């Protein structure tokens, strides 16, 4: 395995290698695979980069070896590798519960753009979980807010966004709290930390709105990397 774009392990310390090794074991294959990973999603950013890499590897090797496994079977195997891996077999959107192994494909009414602001630091999940407190739960947040699925605009969507690990991330990494505050101050609707990672995000309804916000954020003097991305739909994901 070779990797460009990030300094990552290329042995079993990488989810891609572990996923392929596990698939080979279960499928009874002894053939090797030459893997070249072009890393574009920031590492430890709370964006599921490693998990999506593992899922992509399983899909690619399944095709390479003519295994013809179902996506459900690959997702179950992926759950052995990492809790977030099964999600990426039910794209573009899904409701995920339990440890991550229960995945229900769903459809969000909202489609738009998201501005991502990634700090240049590695946020360790174990450290974040160690800083989590029961009081971080928001009793006003439904397990699956129905409005999250039906929100038609970014403003409506923002009213339902919640990250139960956001406070823990800020306690573990105070610089993330500062970044969250800076981005929120320049946004028209607030900002949120993605997962247990180093990325703050803001939803926008159009490419123009996202570009304006990205320009403002790039001018705030931070070393963070600012990107704009578009939400996936079924057609885009299939490609």
Language-model region placement:
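DPxDG-like acidic metal-binding loop motif
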Residues: 16, 45-71, 87
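Phosphate-handling active-site elements
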Residues: 25-36, 60-81, 206-219
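Short, basic/glycine-rich phosphate-binding loops at helix/coil junctions
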Residues: 1-9, 57, 79, 153-162
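N-terminal beta-alpha supersecondary unit
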Residues: 1-44, 230-237
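Conserved, helical-rich catalytic subdomain that frames metal- and/or nucleotide-binding sites
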Residues: 89-190, 205-239
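Conserved glycine-rich beta-strand-loop-beta hairpin in the small C-terminal domain of fold type I
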Residues: 198-199
């Amino acid at each position: 395995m070779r990797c460009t774009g990030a300094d990552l392990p290329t042995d079993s310390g990488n989810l891609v290698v572990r996923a392929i090794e596990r698939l080979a074991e279960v499928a009874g294959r002894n053939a090797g695979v030459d893997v070249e990973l072009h890393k574009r999603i920031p590492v430890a950013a709370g964006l599921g980069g490693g998990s999506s890499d593992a899922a992509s590897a399983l899909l690619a090797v399944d095709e390479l070896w003519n295994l013809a496994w179902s996506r459900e079977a690959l997702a179950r195997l992926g759950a052995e590798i990492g809790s977030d891996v099964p999600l990426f077999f039910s794209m573009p959107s899904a409701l995920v519960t339990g440890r991550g192994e229960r995945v229900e494909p769903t459809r969000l009414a909202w489609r738009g753009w998201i501005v991502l602001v990634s700090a240049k630091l590695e946020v360790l999940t174990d450290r974040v979980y160690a800083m989590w407190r029961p009081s971080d739960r928001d009793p006003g947040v439904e397990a699956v807010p129905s409005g999250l699925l039906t929100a038609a605009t970014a403003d409506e969507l923002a009213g339902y966004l919640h990250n139960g690990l956001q406070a823990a991330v800020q306690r573990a990494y105070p610089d993330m709290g500062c970044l969250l505050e800076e981005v929120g101050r320049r946004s028209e609707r607030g900002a949120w930390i993605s997962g247990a990672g180093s990325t703050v995000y803001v939803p926008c309804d159009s490419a123009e709105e996202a570009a304006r916000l990205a320009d403002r954020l790039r001018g705030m003097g931070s070393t963070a990397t600012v990107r704009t991305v578009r939400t996936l739909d079924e057609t885009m994901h299939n490609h």
